[in-house]
Amino acid sequence: MSGKAWRGTAEAAPIAGVSKPALLHRIEWHTDGPQPVPVSAEVLTLVTDPPASRERFLRTAPDLSADWFSDLRTTVAALRAYPTDRQFPVHDAEEYGYLLSATYRRPVPADCVPAFGTEHIDLNWQNITAPRFCILDMEHWCSAVTGYGAAYLYLTALEVPAVADQVREALADVLDTPSGRYAQLVAAALILRNLTRLPDPGRLAARLRTYTDTLLT
C-alpha cells in the first residue's frame, strides 16, 4: 500500500459532509526484527449496512432510495470542495493524456476538458453501502479530474441500466460538464484496462466501448 493510501482514512477524518465511518483511534508501529515492517491499526465506527454489491461492477440492482442518492450527491460535492495535495499514480494531466491516446487512438473532442479537484478514485459499488449510503474505505482519495468518482460509479453500473440512469440523473451536474465528460473517458479507459484481467460476463467492456464512442464523436 502506498504511503498516501496508508493514511487516507486519517487524513479524510476532518472532511465534513462525506458519509463515511468516523475514525475513533489510530496507531502506527514497526515490528521487531532485522527488517521491521510498518503496521497500522484503525478503529472506526460500525457500519451496519452491507456493500451495495459483492463486486465493484454492478450486476444486480440494489435497494437505492431518494435519500441514498441525496447522500451520494452531498458526499461527492463535499469531497470535491475539500482542498488536497494528495496524489496517486495515473491521476495527473500528463498521464491522462497517455492513457486516453493508448485506449482510444483518436483525439479527445473539444468539449471534453479536464478540471482538477478532490475525488475518491475508488468509488465503486463494493465500497459503498445500501440501503443507507456510506463510503466504507477512504484510503484512495486525491487530486484528480473533476467528476472521476461520479464517472466511475456511473460507468460500472451500465450492466444495470435502470440504476445507471438514476446515477446519471443524480450526478448530471458533474457528468454533463467538459471535465465530467473527460472524467468519463478516463474512468472508462481504466475500467477497460482492468477488464483485460477480469471476467466480463455482462459484456461491460462492449458497453463501455459503445458509450465512449458517443463521447468521442
Identify the role of each PLM range.
Residues 1-52, 58-81:
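A conserved alpha-helical element in kinase catalytic cores
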Residues 11, 155-217:
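A conserved long alpha-helix in the C-terminal portion of kinase-like catalytic domains
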Residues 51-54, 99, 144:
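Short catalytic/ligand-binding loop motif for oxyanion handling, primarily in non-cytosolic enzymes
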Residues 65-68, 72-121:
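An alpha-helical support segment within catalytic cores of ATP-dependent transferases
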Residues 66-80, 125-129, 134-136, 186, ...:
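Short secondary-structure transition/capping segments
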Residues 72, 147-150, 182-185:
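Short runs of predominantly hydrophobic/aromatic residues within well-ordered alpha helices
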Residues 104-148:
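Active-site acidic catalytic loop and adjacent metal/ATP-binding pocket
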Residues 130-173:
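Active-site Asp-x-Gly
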